[in-house]
């Protein structure tokens, strides 16, 4: 009966990050700078890995895939946020909202599975160095990458399949700056208790479990190379530290958002900005600043693209 008497809303209205015009302009410039830097940083990694034959290894192949995902993840929300910061009325159509949610959870799932594959790569590299090339062959890496994208697709389609049949008759105001399941679900004109539990389980609890499994896996990895000599152990620790930092930046905000009842809290928008905008920016910095191999490859690429004038 609810669906029969329900006229589905045609759009949602965002309250956005702020209602203050001056603050909106400052945020616009800041987020534009962050977005452009994110694109350039991840594109630089992709071009370097593609052009430098020394980086044609499983670890950098997986990093290349993560950079693609980070560009996509940032592009799902940030361009719309930039437009809204300059707009008086911040709206999004019903179909666009659900498309944004689908893509958001698709790429978010890809990020989670890709970080897991990268942990597997480090484990094999450190624990089974003699068999590394066989276990992490190019075909296997491609298969794992495809599996990460399929996993993200399945995760996302489950979210949308649960939300789409619900009656959205109004209200249609979202106190956020992008469409996400925990916000949109609260607008459904029906009892959402069971669905909220399913969403928390599918997003929050699984994300929390996955995070601790990854942390444990890296602790195990770091305990493996004790028998290795200094340089090999230092390189392993440096690489794993970068991975742990990225995993923490990605998972902790997600756990805060999804592993609790879907009630609005004062810190929600700031935390959402952290993992939708800031995390894709920091990933390339983290993976390059402590990676001498990547920095050397970038310098070689620069010399090839910008030849020195010196004779």
Curated annotation (Swiss-Prot):
Pfam families the record matches: 7tm_4
Positions annotated with a glycan in the UniProt record: 5
Main location: membrane
Keywords: Cell membrane, G-protein coupled receptor, Glycoprotein, Membrane, Olfaction, Receptor, Sensory transduction, Transducer, Transmembrane, Transmembrane helix
Membrane topology: Multi-pass membrane protein
GO molecular function, one term: olfactory receptor activity
Annotated transmembrane regions: 26-49, 58-79, 101-120, 140-158, 196-219, 236-258, 270-289
Residues exposed to the Cytoplasmic side: 50-57, 121-139, 220-235, 290-311
Localisation: Cell membrane
Extracellular compartment residues: 1-25, 80-100, 159-195, 259-269
Function: Odorant receptor.
Similarity comment: Belongs to the G-protein coupled receptor 1 family.
Record-given protein name: Olfactory receptor 4D10
Species this chain originates from: Homo sapiens (Human)
Gene responsible for this protein: OR4D10
């Amino acid at each position: 009966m609810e669906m029969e008497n329900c006229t589905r809303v045609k759009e949602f209205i965002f309250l956005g990050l702020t209602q203050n015009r001056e603050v909106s302009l400052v945020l616009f410039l800041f987020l534009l700078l962050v977005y452009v830097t994110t694109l350039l940083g991840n594109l630089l990694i992709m071009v370097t890995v593609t052009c430098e034959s020394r980086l044609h290894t499983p670890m950098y192949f997986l990093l290349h895939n993560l950079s693609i995902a980070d560009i996509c993840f940032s592009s799902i929300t940030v361009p719309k946020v930039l437009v809204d910061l300059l707009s008086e009325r911040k709206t999004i159509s019903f179909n666009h909202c659900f498309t944004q949610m689908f893509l958001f959870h698709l790429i978010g799932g890809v990020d989670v599975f890709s970080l897991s594959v990268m942990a597997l790569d480090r484990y094999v590299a450190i624990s089974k160095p003699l068999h590394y090339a066989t276990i992490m062959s190019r075909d296997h890496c491609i298969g794992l990458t495809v599996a990460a994208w399929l996993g993200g697709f399945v995760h996302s389609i489950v979210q949308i399949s649960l939300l789409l049949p619900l009656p959205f008759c109004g209200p249609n105001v979202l106190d956020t700056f992008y469409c996400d399941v925990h916000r949109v679900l609260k607008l459904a004109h029906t009892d959402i208790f069971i669905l909220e539990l399913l969403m928390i389980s599918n997003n929050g609890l699984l994300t929390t479990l996955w995070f601790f499994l990854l942390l444990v896996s890296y602790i195990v990895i770091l305990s493996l190379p004790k028998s290795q000599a200094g340089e090999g152990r230092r390189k392993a620790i440096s690489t794993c530290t970068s991975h742990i930092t990225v995993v923490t930046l990605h998972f902790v905000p997600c756990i805060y958002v999804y592993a609790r009842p879907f009630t609005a809290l004062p810190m929600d928008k700031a935390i959402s900005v952290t993992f939708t905008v800031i995390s894709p920016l920091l990933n390339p910095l983290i993976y390059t600043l402590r990676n001498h191999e990547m920095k050397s490859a970038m310098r070689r690429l620069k010399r090839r693209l910008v030849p020195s004038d010196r004779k």
